[in-house]
Amino acid sequence: MEVLAKHRFARTSPQKCRLVADQIRGLPVAKALEILTFSPKKAAVLVKKVLDSAIANAEHNEGADIDELRVGAIMIDEGPTMKRIMPRAKGRADRIIKRTSHITVVVSDR
C-alpha cells in the first residue's frame, strides 16, 4: 500500500529542498519526523507538513498503522520560476529568478 501527498508551488528552490529530502528517504516515519523537527532549514518545515499529510492520508483513507509506515519515496521537482527585476547602477537591471518546487512524499508499509 502506497499513499502520497503533494505540495505544489512551494516557495523554496529545489536544490535546497533536496538537501532535506535526502536525509529522510527510506526512513520510518517516526524517525523522519524527528529529523525534520530539529532541522534548522526552512525546507524542513515544508517537507514535514507534506509528510504529516501523507501519514494522515494513509491512516484515514487506507486504515494503515502509523508505526509500520516508511518514507517510500520523496521527490522534489522543479516548479515554475518567477522572474523579477533588480535595479542596478547606471540604469541597468538584473534579472532575479525566484524558484519554486513541487514536493511529493510517498509513504508505504513495506
Curated annotation (Swiss-Prot):
GO terms for cellular component: cytosolic large ribosomal subunit. GO terms for biological process: translation. The keyword Ribonucleoprotein applies. PANTHER family: CHLOROPLAST 50S RIBOSOMAL PROTEIN L22-RELATED (PTHR13501), LARGE RIBOSOMAL SUBUNIT PROTEIN UL22M (PTHR13501:SF8). The gene is rplV. Pfam families: Ribosomal_L22 (PF00237). Gene3D superfamilies: Ribosomal protein L22/L17. The keyword Metal-binding does not apply. GO terms for molecular function: rRNA binding; structural constituent of ribosome. PROSITE patterns: RIBOSOMAL_L22. This protein binds specifically to 23S rRNA; its binding is stimulated by other ribosomal proteins, e.g. L4, L17, and L20. It is important during the early stages of 50S assembly. It makes multiple contacts with different domains of the 23S rRNA in the assembled 50S subunit and ribosome. Part of the 50S ribosomal subunit. Belongs to the universal ribosomal protein uL22 family. It comes from the Bacteria. This is Large ribosomal subunit protein uL22. Keywords: Ribonucleoprotein, Ribosomal protein, RNA-binding, rRNA-binding.
